Amino acid sequence: MESIEVRVRTGSRLVSDFTSEIRDFCRRHGDGLLNVFLPHATAGLALIETGSGSEADLAAAIDRFLPRDLAYRHTHGSPGHGRDHLLPALISPSLTLPVLGGEIQLGIWQSVVIVDTNVDNPVRTVRLSFVDA
């Protein structure tokens, strides 16, 4: 297994497309499985279509499911930070993707994105681990 860490600046963006970094890593490999893991308590990974309004739809859904102004018991950090800690329960911090001939096998409209509601931490670490077939 090969495993690397990649640092990503998400800044204030809710959705950061990470697909090109994953493609670059997979090109060095043949067939196998890629695990993408985000070792943070306030962010997750998702497969969505980007550039078609899905990012705004996702933001609206997160605001409905996890409103920032709810009275969370988890109170450190900026206002609404309690919801950030609930996000990975709804949007997993890991994905496992098939790789064939060094190419991740995504659907035509799928992109791998980091979903990050925590504006207090603008830099994230992503672990990419490849297991050969």
Can you name each region flagged by the protein language model?
Residues 1-133:
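Active-site histidine-anchored catalytic micro-motif
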